[in-house]
């Protein structure tokens, strides 16, 4: 039995992950490959919607309960959308691709400070991943953009969806913030090891150029 190839797209907000996931899916399907794509969190089901709502309610109030709730939300998505596709005795797909995975928990669900509480929180999440034998991906494509481009994209996306720019928290997108988030991703990828490797891809340039870089890395 040939297991599906499991690819994760990670990156900061506004990095272009969703676009690149779709482009890769279309490219692979043009080769006759069977491709399943999902995202984490998957807000298309009611349970994930409820868990996400509760996670956001806990934000900045109780970092541990927020982290546990976020893990529960992601683990629910994993059990529903990902694990069955990877472990089926009769695989229905050649590729399983997700827009975000558990690595985002390490980057987004704790305040950006270095202290014992945060470190213990990281180890707590890592312990749960190992306890439940959560499957590591074969490869991670990490898309990165500079803060100015990130802010521009967040503003553009917020306006397109009719949102409130004043509530978009644009001040969080700074060089220092981005560096800290990437540092957390690297920690997570080192400790929750992927099978083959990861690549940092610049998401700031031309969409097609980024797509070509991703195809080259994945050798597809």
Residue ranges and their predicted role:
Residues 9:
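Hydrophobic anchor at the beta1->P-loop junction of P-loop NTPases
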Residues 14:
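Walker A (P-loop) phosphate-binding loop of P-loop NTPases
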Residues 17:
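Conserved lysine of the Walker
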Residues 20:
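Hydrophobic positions on the alpha1 helix immediately C-terminal to the Walker A/P-loop
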Residues 39-124:
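ATP-dependent small-molecule kinase phosphotransfer cores
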Residues 98-101, 133-155:
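Conserved phosphate-donor/acceptor-positioning beta-strand/loop module used by diverse small-molecule
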Residues 123-137:
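Membrane-proximal helix-turn-helix segments that form the acceptor-binding/catalytic region
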Residues 148-220:
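NTP-dependent small-molecule kinase module
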